[in-house]
Every structure is written in structure tokens, then in C-alpha cells.
């Protein structure tokens, strides 16, 4: 038999032969085993002595042993249990039939709508769009929220962050964006949320309409690996539709809990904790996910909104700081504005869209800049105005701001069901600033 044919037959034999090992050591977020040599990223499973199974992903590969992090919890596993190699890398189902469905990061449907009929399995970890293959962001992406469309205009293929403390209104705003945008496909990743918030988000924020949506869900009680890869799985679904030439809205809530999942994994692997206990891998994970969004030449686009939970409303939080450095804009929600009854509570002075000036007309740019200037003057002199120390006529520009204060505040307030077209937002701005 020729040497080449023998080599091929041997390769086929070893590919088809099951590879077994055994558990040597079990820790809270990592299991060590030996018996074969998998690569980092391979998927394995434990066959427990009680007959149940636990699937995991290899995160440590050494000469004598390997370590993997479980997707589900490992109660009942013990040293000596059999470990079986399953496949190289994690894949996730994609296809148009995912629209209207809710899945977990293992690709299992959790919506009681029957078996999922998918087109193919796509790799969960892919490389971001090459820099020179990225299309220029030159089209407006309207979201139906007038304070964003008018003052923080988004572009098709832009990546933005929504930064806020807990209970300020991130989910409500994300629901408004999802319903108000004109993108034909919406992919939503709910990572680390409380279980009760999932049906609430579907019924209250999406109004029960999932016809153009795909939801990937990993709740707070799921393992760190589920919470980590839930975001990557959702991005793979968005990339599938982008590669079909479609414009996709990608919504993720929240980046902070995604990073916290990697913090748990990294600390279990012995990484040194740095700022606020986050290991280096937690910060380096953010661009790996976020840079996969964008606009690609001769294909579609992924316009992404990532919510960032700011602990104690501290915008210098390491995750918030890292996210701001990667994203093309940031929308900051203010707890103070909620106290004044302004919803959505967007702090337009602390927020920015880095592409806005390039995608709207010069007249629209002038309107947005003038509104922000007048609003900034009001905030700067708010105390003087309140106590009556400012005399009208001392500053012409501040006089104009005071006269238009009620109209400007009215512009920033919007009922969550009163979404409006992009052109209407600028018409209202022009009327205020006449």
C-alpha cells in the first residue's frame, strides 16, 4: 500500500475513533483531565457516574493534562469519571428560520416553539472584519428616538455603548431602539440577566413581536462559560445575516456581565487580578467581540448597541473605560434626569457619536451643535437662574437658552411608544432653534 494512502487511512481511523480520558481534579469553574491531547477551544464532555453528562470547553492544554470549563454545572462529577472528546471548536446554528426564536448558547431552543430547523452550523469564534474591507460609515441609521437621531445621530455599521447604572432605563431604551429602527434583522443577546427579565423584555420592550428578531439568552444563574459564549453566539448569527447582504441591528445587554463571566474564568485559571479584580483576559475579550460589528464592503452591516452597567454610576470603571475606547460613540444615561422625570434619561452633554458630523447635512449639524451649546449654557448657569441671580440681558446667548428651556426639555422627553421618523426629529429641532 502506498505510504500516502496508509497515512490517510490512519488519519481517518483516529478521527473516527472516540478519544477518552478521565477526570483528575475538579475545581469550582475548571476541571482537569488527562488521556488525550485536545486543543484550546475544543469541546469535551464528562460522562458522570450517575448517568448524566456535562459539556465543557478546553481552556488549558498542557503536555500531561488539560483543563476545561463546564457549560453547565458539575454537581455529581467526581475524579475518575470518563471524559470524551466531542468536536473541534464551538459552533452555533444559523439560518433564516432562527427569526422569532429564543436560544441558549448551546444552540438549544428555549421558547417551546418546537424543533429548530436551521441552515448550517457556523463557528462561534471568527476574526473581525479586516480593516481595509470595512465600508465607510456614510448612511444614517435611524432609531426612532429623537434625542439620539437629532443630537447623537448613528450611522449604519456604527458601534455604540449605552452606559448607565442599574435601574436607570437601559432595557427600555434598547427596546425603543429595537422597535424604532428600520433594520430588517435584529439580533439580541441578553447576557447575565435575571430570569424574570427575559419574558419582560420580550413582552414589554419588544411588545411581543419577535418576527424579525433572534434572541440568544444566558441568564445570571448560567455558568460563566455560557454567559461568555452567549455574546459570541449572537454575534455569529448577526454575521450570517450580514454576509447575506442585510443590515442587522445587534443589541447586547450587558457587556459588564459578559466581562464578569470572563473574570470568573480567568481567576479560576490563576490570572492575576488587576483593576477592580478584572484579569487581563477580561479586558482583551471586549475588542474580540465588538470589532466583529461594522459595515463590510459588498456585504451588509451590523450596527451594534452594547449596554454597559456602570457600577455606582462610575464612568471610570475599567470595563466602561475599555468599552469607550473601542466603540464609535457612547450614550450616557443619567440617574439625575430620571429624578426630573426626563425619559429616556440621556445626558446629551456627556454623550457623543463619533460619526454624526459625517453623515448628516451641514444645516443639521448646525442645529445639533446649537442645541447642545444652549443646553450646556443652561446647565452651567442653572444655580444662578434658580436663585434669581441672573439678570436677563447680561448674556444674549444665555437669554436665548432660558427662553427655549421648556422647548428643549420637551424635545428630550419621549414616550417609549411614541417613536418617530428621522426627518421629524430634525424638523422639531429647527422649530425650537428658530
Swiss-Prot record:
EC class name: translocase
Q: Which residues make up the binding site for ATP?
A: 164-171
Q: What is its EC number?
A: 7.1.2.2
Q: InterPro entries per the record?
A: AAA+_ATPase, ATPase_a/bsu_AS, ATPase_alpha/beta_chains, ATPase_F1/V1/A1_a/bsu_nucl-bd, ATPase_T3SS_FliI/YscN, P-loop_NTPase, T3SS_ATPase_C
Gene Ontology biological process terms from the UniProt entry:
bacterial-type flagellum organization; protein secretion by the type III secretion system
Please give the Gene Ontology molecular function terms for this protein.
ATP binding; ATP hydrolysis activity; proton-transporting ATP synthase activity, rotational mechanism
Pfam families attached to this UniProt entry: ATP-synt_ab, T3SS_ATPase_C
Q: Which domain of life is it from?
A: Bacteria
Subcellular location field: Cytoplasm
One cellular component term from this protein's GO annotations in UniProt: cytoplasm
Q: Which reaction does it catalyse?
A: ATP + H2O + 4 H(+)(in) = ADP + phosphate + 5 H(+)(out)
Keywords, alphabetical: ATP synthesis, ATP-binding, Bacterial flagellum biogenesis, Bacterial flagellum protein export, Cytoplasm, Hydrogen ion transport, Ion transport, Nucleotide-binding, Protein transport, Translocase, Transport
What PANTHER family does the database record attribute to this sequence? ATP SYNTHASE, SPI-1 TYPE 3 SECRETION SYSTEM ATPASE
Similarity annotation? Belongs to the ATPase alpha/beta chains family.
Q: What does the UniProt function comment say about this protein?
A: Probable catalytic subunit of a protein translocase for flagellum-specific export, or a proton translocase involved in local circuits at the flagellum.
This one is known as Flagellum-specific ATP synthase
The scientific name of the source species is Helicobacter pylori (strain J99 / ATCC 700824)
Amino acid at each position: 500500500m502506498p505510504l500516502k494512502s496508509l497515512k490517510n487511512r490512519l488519519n481517518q481511523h483516529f478521527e473516527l475513533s472516540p478519544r477518552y480520558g478521565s477526570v483528575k481534579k475538579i475545581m469550582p469553574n475548571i476541571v482537569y483531565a488527562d488521556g488525550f491531547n485536545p486543543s484550546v477551544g475544543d469541546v469535551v464532555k464528562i460522562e458522570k457516574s450517575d448517568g448524566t453528562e456535562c459539556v465543557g470547553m478546553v481552556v488549558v492544554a498542557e503536555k500531561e493534562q488539560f483543563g476545561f470549563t463546564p457549560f453547565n454545572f458539575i454537581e455529581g462529577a467526581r475524579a475518575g469519571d470518563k471524559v470524551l472528546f466531542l468536536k473541534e471548536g464551538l459552533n452555533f446554528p444559523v439560518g433564516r428560520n432562527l427569526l422569532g426564536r429564543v436560544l441558549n448558547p448551546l444552540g438549544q431552543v428555549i421558547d417551546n416553539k418546537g424543533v429548530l430547523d436551521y441552515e448550517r452550523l457556523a463557528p462561534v469564534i471568527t476574526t473581525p472584519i479586516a480593516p481595509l474591507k470595512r465600508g465607510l460609515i456614510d448612511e444614517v441609521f435611524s432609531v426612532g428616538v429623537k434625542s439620539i437621531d437629532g443630537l447623537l445621530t448613528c450611522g449604519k455599521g456604527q458601534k455604540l455603548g449605552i452606559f448607565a447604572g442599574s435601574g436607570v432605563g437601559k432595557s427600555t431604551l434598547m427596546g425603543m431602539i429595537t422597535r424604532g429602527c428600520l433594520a430588517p434583522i435584529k439580533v439580541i443577546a441578553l447576557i447575565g440577566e435575571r430570569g424574570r427579565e427575559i419574558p419582560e423584555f420580550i413582552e414589554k420592550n419588544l411588545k411581543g413581536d419577535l418576527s424579525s428578531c433572534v434572541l440568544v439568552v444566558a441568564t445570571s444563574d448560567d455558568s460563566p462559560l455560557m454567559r461568555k459564549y452567549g455574546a459570541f453566539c449572537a454575534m455569529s448569527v448577526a454575521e450570517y445575516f450580514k454576509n447575506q447582504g442585510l443590515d442587522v441591528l445587534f443589541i447586547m445587554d450587558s457587556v459588564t456581565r459578559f466581562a464578569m463571566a470572563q473574570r470568573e474564568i480567568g481567576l479560576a485559571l490563576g490570572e492575576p487580578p488587576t483593576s477592580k479584580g478584572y484579569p487581563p483576559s477580561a479586558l482583551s475579550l471586549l475588542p474580540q467581540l465588538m470589532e466583529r460589528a461594522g459595515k463590510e464592503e459588498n456585504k451588509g452591516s451590523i450596527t451594534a448597541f452594547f449596554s454597559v452597567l456602570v457600577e455606582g454610576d462610575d464612568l471610570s470603571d475599567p470595563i466602561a473605560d475599555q468599552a469607550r475606547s473601542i466603540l464609535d460613540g457612547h450614550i450616557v444615561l443619567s440617574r439625575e434626569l430620571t429624578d426630573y422625570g426626563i425619559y429616556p434619561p440621556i445626558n446629551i452633554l456627556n454623550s457623543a457619536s463619533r460619526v454624526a458630523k459625517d453623515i448628516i447635512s451641514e444645516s443639521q449639524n448646525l442645529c445639533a451643535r446649537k442645541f447642545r451649546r444652549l443646553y450646556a449654557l443652561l446647565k452651567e448657569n442653572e444655580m444662578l437662574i434658580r436663585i434669581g441671580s441672573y439678570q436677563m440681558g447680561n448674556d444674549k446667548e444665555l437669554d436665548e437658552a432660558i427662553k427655549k428651556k421648556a422647548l428643549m426639555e420637551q424635545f428630550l422627553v419621549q414616550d417609549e411608544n411614541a417613536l418617530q421618523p428621522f426627518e421629524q426629529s430634525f424638523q422639531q429641532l429647527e422649530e425650537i432653534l428658530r
